[in-house]
């Protein structure tokens, strides 16, 4: 089955499960529980509940192998990360996006390759003269009432 290219809103706990499945390519509930048991202190029942939600949201698809269900990603990790980032930026003033990106770069631990990729994108970027505030009046400093 081909991965979807749409944003599926998932909770922080569901992200943890998806990260395991994206890494492994496919997994059953026991495998996921083993990987997340120490850090999350989850039991199999918790993982199965999260898997059920992810299947319902169409983030995963399943196949049955004997008595076990094997879970496969139905959404791309990179597309979901990109969509989550766009969603984050939609919640802040457009005039703050650049400063927010700069803050993220400042806080992140980066390799030389990471820095080169960021610099490459910045060098290709054409600046605009001004950025218009996209907030409702009263939501930011730009449009104080």
UniProtKB/Swiss-Prot annotation:
UniProt xrefs under Pfam families: Penicillinase_R
Major subcellular site: cytoplasm
Keywords: Copper, Cytoplasm, DNA-binding, Metal-binding, Repressor, Transcription, Transcription regulation, Zinc
Compartment(s) where it occurs, according to its Swiss-Prot or TrEMBL record: Cytoplasm
Induction context: By copper.
Regions crossing the membrane: none
Listed GO CC annotations: cytoplasm
Keyword flag DNA damage: no
Domain of life: Bacteria
GO molecular function, one term: DNA binding
GO biological process: negative regulation of DNA-templated transcription
Binding site for Zn(2+): 133, 135, 140, 142
Function, in words: Acts as a copper responsive repressor. Binds to DNA in complex with Zn(2+), repressing the transcription of the copYZAB operon. Exchange of the bound zinc by two copper ions delivered by CopZ Cu(1+)-bound form causes release of CopY from the promoter, leading to the transcription of the operon.
Subunit structure, as described in the record: Homodimer. Interacts with CopZ Cu(1+)-bound form via a charge-based interaction.
Similarity comment: family membership: Belongs to the BlaI transcriptional regulatory family.
Protein name per UniProt: Transcriptional repressor CopY
Gene designation: copY
């Amino acid at each position: 089955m081909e991965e979807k290219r749409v944003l599926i809103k998932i909770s922080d706990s569901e992200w943890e499960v998806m990260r395991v499945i994206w890494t492994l390519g496919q997994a059953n509930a026991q495998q996921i529980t083993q990987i997340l048991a120490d850090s999350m202190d989850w039991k199999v029942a918790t993982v199965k509940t999260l898997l059920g939600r992810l299947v319902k949201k169409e983030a995963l698809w399943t196949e049955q192998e004997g008595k076990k269900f094997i879970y496969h990603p139905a959404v791309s990790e990179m597309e979901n990360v990109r969509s989550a980032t766009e969603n984050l930026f939609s919640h802040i003033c457009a005039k703050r996006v650049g400063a927010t990106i700069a803050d993220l770069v400042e806080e992140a631990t980066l390799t030389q390759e990471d820095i080169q990729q960021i610099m490459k994108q910045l060098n290709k970027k054409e600046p605009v003269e001004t950025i218009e505030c996209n907030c409702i009046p009263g939501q930011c400093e730009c449009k104080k009432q």
